[in-house]
Curated annotation (Swiss-Prot):
Recorded GO CC terms: cytoplasm; microtubule
UniProt cross-references to Pfam families, sorted A to Z: Tubulin, Tubulin_C
Acidic residues bias (residue ranges): 429-446
Binding residues annotated for Mg(2+), in chain numbering: 69
UniProt xrefs under SUPFAM superfamilies: Tubulin C-terminal domain-like, Tubulin nucleotide-binding domain-like
GO biological process: microtubule-based process; response to antibiotic
Family as reported in the entry's similarity comment: Belongs to the tubulin family.
Record's function text: Tubulin is the major constituent of microtubules, a cylinder consisting of laterally associated linear protofilaments composed of alpha- and beta-tubulin heterodimers. Microtubules grow by the addition of GTP-tubulin dimers to the microtubule end, where a stabilizing cap forms. Below the cap, tubulin dimers are in GDP-bound state, owing to GTPase activity of alpha-tubulin.
Keywords: Antibiotic resistance, Cytoplasm, Cytoskeleton, GTP-binding, Magnesium, Metal-binding, Microtubule, Nucleotide-binding
Protein's name in the database: Tubulin beta chain
Taxon lineage: Eukaryota, Fungi, Dikarya, Ascomycota, Pezizomycotina
Cofactor field: Mg(2+)
Region feature (Disordered): 421-446
Name of encoding gene: TUB2
Amino acid sequence: MREIVHLQTGQCGNQIGAAFWQTISGEHGLDSNGVYNGTSELQLERMSVYFNERSGNKYVPRAVLVDLEPGTMDAVRAGPFGQLFRPDNFVFGQSGAGNNWAKGHYTEGAELVDQVLDVVRREAEGCDCLQGFQITHSLGGGTGAGMGTLLISKIREEFPDRMMATFSVVPSPKVSDTVVEPYNATLSVHQLVENSDETFCIDNEALYDICMRTLKLSNPSYGDLNYLVSAVMSGVTTCLRFPGQLNSDLRKLAVNMVPFPRLHFFMVGFAPLTSRGAHSFRAVSVPELTQQMFDPKNMMAASDFRNGRYLTCSAIFRGRVAMKEVEDQMRNVQNKNSSYFVEWIPNNIQTALCAIPPRGLTMSSTFIGNSTSIQELFKRVGEQFTAMFRRKAFLHWYTGEGMDEMEFTEAESNMNDLVSEYQQYQDAGIDEEEEEYEEELPEGEE
């Protein structure tokens, strides 16, 4: 079976990760100790993608939990699903990274990284045919951002031909918990552009908006936000966990979604959105799902796709859905919103179906879009970065850990390049492409 090893780093990564494991354990009929008491054969069929089978019908997640301070880990261990994880897979330091990317990437994190890699290696060896890794982390902090990206590059070195998917929580414009977020995020994006194969961008502010606007929660907790993220993660990984007809692994997803290797930052959405307690009180139909799924208010990254164009996108429908109806709806969406799709990639929407809906719903859909409007997100971080970096504010925290200003300049220009690449493909039309191509031919020296 095509296994995936899951890593969660830092406070944010561990909390999202814990919510994710809680969600998929439920979908696979496992209780909080990992004992199977489900009802359907389908739950067992591809269980091994995320779980190792132990004796006595008990399943253990292929998860590695990493943090530079023990606090969050203890919380996970004491939480409802704390007994699920293998105790040796908790790897933590004592000092904390203090929201400092350099500590996570170069000093504190670098000391812990070998220990983590040992655990990763052990998990990888227990796999039949490892398909890749997924990592949950935030880009604004120290451990998730600094050490998370360090782990990604180390794993890249050791498993160069395996997929690397990241679920990255990007700093949001209004909700910020540390002043150095723009630094940490820019340095992380600089790493992700080079080392990750697919990055699902999640944004706290967009999640707050969804909670307040759509779910009508007056003051959402992180628990509510993580619940939304875990719904999307569960949706994105559906095809990997249940027998489906399309898009059954990370590599296929990447091949269909990434037209140019650097442009692998996706926005995600989920429908139907229901708050944690109130599972849908009405029947959902495919047209409704499709409409809600393509609604800008449903995107979990704070960038509006109406300001850009989709290079590619993928929709995953779950539940008892008629294939024909889905195809009609998707064609419909593409015809109505044709201006939001680039015309030089024909058929750039693809759909996947899975017969098993999430718990408590009859059907649901998950949306993954590679839109050029994601550049808004990088632009925003870039502006904040520049404002601080011009004055060299807070820089001593980083140089004190042995970093060089040069690295900041590099990261900044790499991110600016990324933004202009997105812009270039947003503006490109069919006819221009051909003209450019003809102009470039005579030189042929590259």
